[in-house]
């Protein structure tokens, strides 16, 4: 009976250890995913800033030429 208790205790102990290791790995993966999401959001904001700067430079060159043409057609 004592050997059965020891075996059962060993199985339970190893089960708890493996569960705790799995939980740690899952937490680490979740943290890594959150970091990647943060990096992706930063990259997205950089892309948006790049897009707005391109649109701004296009607007600087196009608007002064388009406004007089529109004014001629309307007036």
Curated annotation (Swiss-Prot):
One of its GO terms (cellular component) is other organism cell membrane. Residues 30-45 have a biased composition (Acidic residues). Pfam families: Caerin_1 (PF07440), FSAP_sig_propep (PF03032). Expressed by the skin glands. It is found in: Secreted; Target cell membrane. GO terms for biological process: defense response to bacterium; innate immune response. Residues 24-48 are annotated as: Disordered. Its main location: secreted. Residues 23-49 form a propeptide. It comes from the Eukaryota. The keyword Membrane applies. The keyword Secreted applies. The modification Leucine amide is found at residue 74. Residues 1-22 form the signal peptide. Keywords: Amidation, Amphibian defense peptide, Antibiotic, Antimicrobial, Cleavage on pair of basic residues, Immunity, Innate immunity, Membrane, Secreted, Signal, Target cell membrane, Target membrane. Belongs to the frog skin active peptide (FSAP) family. Caerin subfamily. Cationic amphipathic alpha-helical antimicrobial peptide with weak or no activity against both Gram-positive and Gram-negative bacteria. Is weakly active against E.coli (MIC=25 uM), E.cloacae (MIC=50 uM), K.pneumoniae (MIC=25 uM), and S.haemolyticus (MIC=50 uM). Has no activity against S.typhimurium, S.enteritidis, B.megaterium, and S.aureus (MIC>100 uM). This is Caerin 1.11. It comes from Ranoidea caerulea (Green tree frog).
């Amino acid at each position: 009976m004592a050997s059965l208790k020891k075996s059962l205790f060993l199985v339970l102990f190893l089960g708890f250890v493996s569960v705790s290791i799995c939980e740690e790995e899952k937490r680490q993966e979740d943290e890594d995913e959150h970091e990647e999401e943060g990096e992706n959001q930063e990259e997205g904001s950089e892309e948006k800033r790049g897009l707005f700067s391109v649109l701004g430079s296009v607007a600087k060159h196009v608007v002064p030429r388009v406004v007089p043409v529109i004014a001629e057609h309307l007036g």
